[in-house]
Amino acid sequence: MRHPREENSIVVELEPSLATFIKQGFNNLVKWPLLNIGIVLSNTSTAINEEWLTVVEHIPTMKIFYKHIHKILTREMGFLVYLKRSQSERDNYITLYDFDYYIIDKDTNSVTMVDKPTELKETLLHVFQEYRLKSSQTIELIAFSSGTVINEDIVSKLTFLDVEVFNREYNNVKTIMNPDFVSRSPFIVISPMGKLTFFVEVYSWFDFKSCFKDIIDFLEGALIANIHNHMIKVGDCDETVSSYNPESGILFVNDLMTMNIVNFFGCNSRLESYHRFDITKVDVELFIKALSDACKKILLASNRL
């Protein structure tokens, strides 16, 4: 019988600078939003509001919204979670299954509930204190994924809660909310000496290989777009940007993309340093092909899980 959660690693051997390029791209571009826009609507539990919001912010939502990975990474979609739970003599705890989970279409602000796996019942979130009939503890809260714009349109779609209470509590806390996009990487990725390794968690209730492919496809597209948009200044080197002096053949490296690409073509560069290098050796299309081949190799390795 397969365990509901398994830790695995996906390993591929690549040219070291290409492996580093993919690792750095993954860490900088593959950003899964946290639930940092949280509003407590009612709380008579022994945990204070800040404790609830901190715990909810870091709920591992990718294993719940796995059908929407690509659109969440491109920020076409966001999501929210909602909890309304009262203590009873029979049920004295809260699990992740007690939440309702909704996907948000950012074009229309439509809010759609998604199915939740029954396995979430095994993930304990909170235990109430001893039950007393006359002082039953309750908690009601809602949390949106980072980057969600809270406006009248989206609030009108929250038909499962008291909008008046929501507006009051949201107005009380919105000035102290972090306006920045807050996220985490879905996996830890390392690349020592070209050994690109993804440390992943595989769950029994969905097709991890399909989800991993969505992530790698997103990463490949984002990296190729960044390569096409990347520029190296030609002329005198001024140590503010990566630049190349064709007269002296000196290259100043000041960003990770330049460093990894020129190293792929034989330069032994480091950040914020000068190197004598023939820039004509760089073939961008050849590098992109190597990147695409590497992504195929990564997906092939993931299929062996």
Curated annotation (Swiss-Prot):
Keywords: DNA-directed RNA polymerase, Nucleotidyltransferase, Phosphoprotein, Transcription, Transferase, Virion. Its EC number is 2.7.7.6. One of its GO terms (molecular function) is DNA-directed RNA polymerase activity. Its main location: virion. Part of the DNA-dependent RNA polymerase which catalyzes the transcription of viral DNA into RNA using the four ribonucleoside triphosphates as substrates. Responsible for the transcription of early, intermediate and late genes. DNA-dependent RNA polymerase associates with the early transcription factor (ETF), itself composed of D6 and A7, thereby allowing the early genes transcription. Late transcription, and probably also intermediate transcription, require newly synthesized RNA polymerase. The keyword Transmembrane helix does not apply. Belongs to the poxviridae DNA-directed RNA polymerase 35 kDa subunit family. This is DNA-directed RNA polymerase 35 kDa subunit. The DNA-dependent RNA polymerase used for intermediate and late genes expression consists of eight subunits 147 kDa, 133 kDa, 35 kDa, 30 kDa, 22 kDa, 19 kDa, 18 kDa and 7 kDa totalling more than 500 kDa in mass. The same holoenzyme, with the addition of the transcription-specificity factor RAP94, is used for early gene expression. GO terms for biological process: viral transcription.
